[in-house]
Design a protein with these regions (language model features):
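Basic polyanion-binding and macromolecular-assembly surfaces
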Residues: 1-40, 44-360
Length: 360
């Protein structure tokens, strides 16, 4: 039985002038790496974009995507009302969540709570049951309902409940903060807005402002612990989800200031590996920042990634069990394939690896 199986996704993607992920001052997020300032897009921002893509691009069924919200009471109330219209759904929903150990009041739960559609239905079904005699057993049943049947995105990204760690789910996927492969200096766009109803003899602007932005070639990385995913979802579903995760990670993008910059791009190159030892982030390829040249940043970044991976496999890490690339420039690591073909082959490869190796 294989105890370890990981799928690593490495993406190089060039983004034009943009501000897709801002800090508290409105500036594009940055990080110091290799002694220089890099553009940065947070892990949270890209995971949110991926969860949206799961639904908007029909990569997962809606039932497979959970809700992260403080309005859990309302979700359970709605389900109770559908099951038992004659009962006081609002009162029953609050009581049910209290018994389940989820603190809530008229404003909702104290903190955001990640819950699946199946868990909502299970809580509602228990709430309308008329044969409740053992209150302790009932509360345990409510807790069990919240521990079973996670949505796909809960299985992927995990759930943390500070008030009750027994409801936590360990994430099967990790998504790194994306950083530019080169040094970046933020710039400012000074803009004016015209008042369409301004008098003709007043030529001044109706509004003045600035917006901060940068452009970058980003290195993006994510990994999926396939055995952990299989433990929650089963072998066949896990393989399908790895494919959906890969497509969402590769094609999605956070939406910050997108109407201002129209910065939606697709990757320049993708490198995917199946590993049986550990996940391997290849950001070390860019610890020495790629220098500006007439070639731009994308092509030198591909060369740096390819050379670093080859060197790493010769010294510290075993070569991947299987490798795939999309786009040009990384063919020395694996033959290039169209994206959809690569994802299909990846799904089949994961299925093959899981056959006979299911977690019991």
């Amino acid at each position: 039985m294989k105890k370890r199986l990981y799928v690593d996704f490495h993406v190089l993607q060039t983004v034009p002038p943009s501000c897709i992920n801002r800090d508290d001052t409105g500036s594009p997020k940055t990080a110091i790496y290799g002694g220089v300032t890099r553009a940065r897009v947070s892990s949270q921002a890209w995971k949110h974009a991926m969860r949206q893509a799961f639904v908007e691009e029909s990569l997962l069924d809606e039932e497979d995507v959970g809700k992260r919200t403080k309005k859990v009471t309302e979700l359970v109330e709605k389900e109770i009302a559908a099951l038992a219209p004659e009962k006081d759904a609002a009162k029953l929903a609050k009581k049910t969540l209290d018994n389940a150990g989820i603190k809530n009041d008229e404003k909702g739960t104290k903190a955001l709570f990640f819950i699946s559609q199946a868990q909502i239905k299970a809580l509602a079904t228990l709430a309308v049951a008329d044969d409740i005699e053992d209150k302790k057993a009932y509360k345990e049943a409510l807790q069990k309902a919240l521990r079973k049947n996670p949505s796909v995105d809960i299985a992927l990204f995990g759930r943390m409940v500070a008030d009750d760690p027994s409801l936590n789910f360990d994430a099967a996927a990790q998504v790194a903060h994306s950083i530019s492969t080169h040094a970046v200096q933020n710039e400012y766009d000074y803009f004016t807005a015209v008042d369409d109803c301004q008098a003709e003899d007043n030529a001044g602007a109706g509004h003045l402002g600035t917006v901060e932005y940068n452009s970058a070639t980003l290195y993006r990385y994510a990994t999926v612990n396939v055995m952990e995913l299989e433990r929650h979802l089963g072998a066949e579903k896990a393989a399908e989800v790895v494919r959906s995760f890969g497509e969402a990670f590769i094609r999605s993008m956070p939406t910050g200031k997108q109407n201002t910059f129209a910065n939606r791009t697709l990757p320049d190159a993708v490198y995917v590996t199946i590993r049986e030892d550990q996940p391997v982030n290849l950001c070390g390829a860019f610890e020495r920042a790629v220098r500006k040249s007439a070639e731009g940043y994308a092509e030198p970044s591909k060369s740096a990634l390819q050379a670093y991976a080859q060197q790493l496999y010769q010294s510290f890490a075993e070569a991947p069990a299987k490798s795939f690339t999309v786009g040009t420039g990384l063919e020395a690591l694996a033959p290039a394939q169209p994206l959809n073909t690569m994802l299909d082959v990846l799904e089949e490869a994961v299925k093959e690896n899981l056959t006979g190796n299911e977690v019991e």
